[in-house]
Amino acid sequence: MPNADLIEQLATVAARRLGGNMRLLALYGSAAENPLPAHDLDFLLVVDAVENCVTQATQKCRDIYPNVQFFVLNTDEYRALPAFYRFQFAFARCLRGDLDLPPALRADAVDSILQGYTDTLRTLRQQFKRRKWAIADDWARQVWWDLKSFKYATLDLCWLLRGERPQDVGRAALILQGQGLTAAAEAVSEWPNLETAATQLKTEPLRWVLRWEKRVSAAFAEVRPLLSSK
C-alpha cells in the first residue's frame, strides 16, 4: 500500500529541482498524521514554484495517487484560491518549507461549507442527466472524488460549531450528533471508502447516486440555517 514516504520523496525531489531561490510547501489536505491508503491523501500543494520544475517530480505521485489534486502556485495565486481550498490547507501538515499561511477564518469556513455542499449536490444531480451510465472504474473514482467536497464541508462545519476539525468521519459524526444535526451525522458516518464506492457505483450506479443525493440534501437542509447566523 502506498504511504507517506512517497510524498516525502516527492518533496525532496521537488525542492532540489526548485533550488535555493524558491520556497516549497507541500501539504496533506486531509491533515492526517500518517496517511496510508491512497484515498487518505487528498491534496498536495507546492507554493512559490515554477510549474515546469516540478512536473516530472509530481508525475510519479500522480500515477500512484490518481485521486490527488495537485496545486503548483506562486504566492499570489495561492491567495486567490477559493475559500474551500484555502480552508483545507489551513489545517494541513507541512512537509517542507516555512511559508506562512493565512489562519483559518470563520468567513472562509462558511464559504467552504456552502461550496462543499453545493458542489456535491450539483455533481450528483448531473449524473441523472447521463443518457448512458459510464460503468467504468475511472468514472466511479471521479464521482467518489467529487463527493469528497461533502466530507470536507462536514469537517469544516465541526470547526465552525465547536472549534475542532476532526481527522476522521467517526469523530465528525459524534460532534454533529451532539449538536442535534442528525441527518448530517448519519450521512458522514456512512462515508464510503474508495473501493466500496467504486464497486457500488459500477454495479448499481443509479441507486448509489439517488441514495447519496437524498442524504446530502437532508444534511444540507439542517446545516444551511446555521450558516446564515455565523
Give the label of every model feature segment.
Residues 1-16, 20, 32-38, 48-230:
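Catalytic core of pol beta-like nucleotidyltransferases
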Residues 21-28:
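Short, glycine- and small/hydrophobic-rich beta-strand elements in well-ordered beta-sheets
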Residues 43-45:
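A structural signal for short, well-ordered beta-strand segments
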